[in-house]
Amino acid sequence: MLENPHVTETEALLVAKVPVTTPRDKIHEVMGPAISEVYAMVLEQGRSPVGPWFTHHLRVDPAVFDFEACVPVDQPVAAAGRVVPGDWPATRVARAIYQGPYEGLGEAWGAFKAWVAAQGLTGRDDLYERYLVGPESTTDGTQFRTELNQPLV
């Protein structure tokens, strides 16, 4: 389920992002449009994505998703519509790869957080997921690859 859990330091990034707060059962309705909106604005402003898109979950809440849909970019973007610019600082994180359908992410996060705790590490309240292989690449959910990142205190 989880591949290669380890601790690493991320690089600082410029991002274009759309903040989203939605009930958990509506995530499938809002995720795609949010990412499409970010990519459209990035391209409209003549910027280029410089890596996979990701979601920065600001907090974990059983009732809602409170996150930012982010695209790393080569140059800053101007705020337009719901899209805002952001800086993603270099951060020490615990990281692992989950391979499988998105429906298994909750269980994967549980196993990953248990690994983090077993290492004597303390995670912050936020977390993020980078989508390395998803529905834009294959219709086979067992082939999806999601990078799990737990920023550390």
Residue positions per predicted region:
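A solvent-exposed interaction/effector surface
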Residues: 1-153
